[in-house]
From Swiss-Prot:
Methyltransferase listed as a keyword: no
4-aspartylphosphate PTM sites in chain numbering: 252
Sequence ranges assigned to domain CheW-like in this UniProt record: 19-177
Traits of the deletion mutant: Deletion shows a severe inhibitory effect on chemotaxis, although swarming is not completely abolished. Mutant also shows defects in mouse colonization.
Protein name: Chemotaxis protein CheV1
GO biological process: chemotaxis; phosphorelay signal transduction system
PROSITE patterns (alphabetical): CHEW, RESPONSE_REGULATORY
Job description of the protein: Plays an essential role in chemotaxis signal transduction system in order to colonize the host stomach. May act as a phosphate sink to control the flow of phosphate to CheAY.
CDD domains according to UniProt: CheW_like
Keyword vocabulary terms for this entry: Phosphoprotein
């Protein structure tokens, strides 16, 4: 219980100051720096246990299954994923796996997000980097073709070197495409929602935005989409925007320039917009993030891009009686 409360206090402190913490790591010796939000990482371990091979295909992104603290989880080699191309799924990825010196243990990030727990092999963990969200820059369009982006944002290391933040939700979709297939199946069960009001949607992941657009289109609701919280806020508070036409805001939590927490804070603290419902759509579904979002007066918190959850909240806040 004490650990749980400490976690909530830590998240609260960071987001009240519009800050985030990133675990920096490399995929090769003396290579580029990459990062993932620390709240998506349970721990980093040295692993020298058994690896249960589940696929012998040359293009497999899953190395096999490992056991960490009595939990069996899939192991993914992040470097191999960086060379994966969704337009060429049969590409041989074996030459791109992370290579360690003989006798060296694997370094594995145990990641928890979107209700999944996975192991991600990296070359080495570096250190934790604390940043303001305003110090994060958008990376949409980098790290591959428009449909193959693997990076969502970038910032600078202590010495000025570039640090690139990985789109770990995109990795999950690429590794387990049936997750998206299930969402597409759920799409077919959705029914139209009758409303004249508009939804404002913010997410920095192109893959998530695409999925959310499909869901909202299927529901038949008007929506305006933004690549981060800053652009959403600029639109919302533009003098030409008719706030009375906005019936709902759906926002991610971690976004460059202005986070979802900043969106909630600014919208709820302004008398002109305080009545607009805000739903958090996040893969960081831990209790500390949910508690923090609700403490800032978010109206609901749902798991990332779940069609049935989206239908529920849109129906709740938008549908005309």
């Amino acid at each position: 219980m004490a650990d749980s409360l400490a976690g909530i206090d830590q998240v609260t402190s960071l987001h009240k100051n519009n800050e985030l913490q990133l675990l920096c790591f490399r995929l090769g010796k003396n290579k580029d720096l990459y990062a993932v939000n620390v709240f998506k990482i349970r721990e980093v371990v040295k692993y020298h246990g058994n690896l249960t091979i589940i696929s012998h295909e040359n293009n497999s992104l899953v190395e096999g299954l490992i056991i960490i603290r009595e939990l069996t989880i899939p192991l993914i080699d992040m470097k191999k994923w960086f060379y994966y191309d969704s337009q060429n799924k049969n590409k041989d990825l074996r030459p791109y796996r992370i290579e360690k010196e003989k006798g060296e243990d694997d370094i594995v990030m145990i990641c928890e997000f979107s209700r999944w727990t996975i192991g991600v092999r990296i070359y080495e963990a570096d250190r934790i980097l604390s940043k303001k969200w305003t110090e994060m820059e958008q990376s949409a369009g980098l790290g591959g073709s428009a449909g193959n982006n693997k990076l969502v944002s970038r910032t600078r290391y202590f010495d000025g070197r570039l640090v690139q933040v990985v789109d770990i939700e995109k990795m999950l979709i690429d590794v387990f495409p049936w997750i998206e297939d299930e969402k597409h199946n759920d799409l077919e069960t959705l029914s139209k929602i009758h409303s004249n009001q508009c939804v404002l949607l913010a997410d920095d992941s192109p893959s998530v935005l695409k999925t959310m657009q499909m869901i909202l289109d299927k529901l038949g609701v008007k929506h305006i989409d933004f690549i981060n919280g800053k652009t959403l806020l600029e639109h919302l508070f533009n003098p030409t925007t008719d706030v009375s036409n906005i019936g709902l805001i759906i926002t991610d939590l971690e976004m460059p320039e202005a986070s979802g927490f900043e969106v909630i804070k600014q919208v709820k603290n302004n008398p002109l917009t305080s009545k607009i419902p805000i739903v958090v759509n996040s893969s960081m579904s831990g209790s500390s993030n949910e508690d923090m979002a609700r403490s800032l007066k978010a109206d609901d918190f749902i798991s990332k891009s779940n069609p049935k959850d989206i239908q529920r909240v849109v129906k709740q806040f938008l549908e005309l009686a």
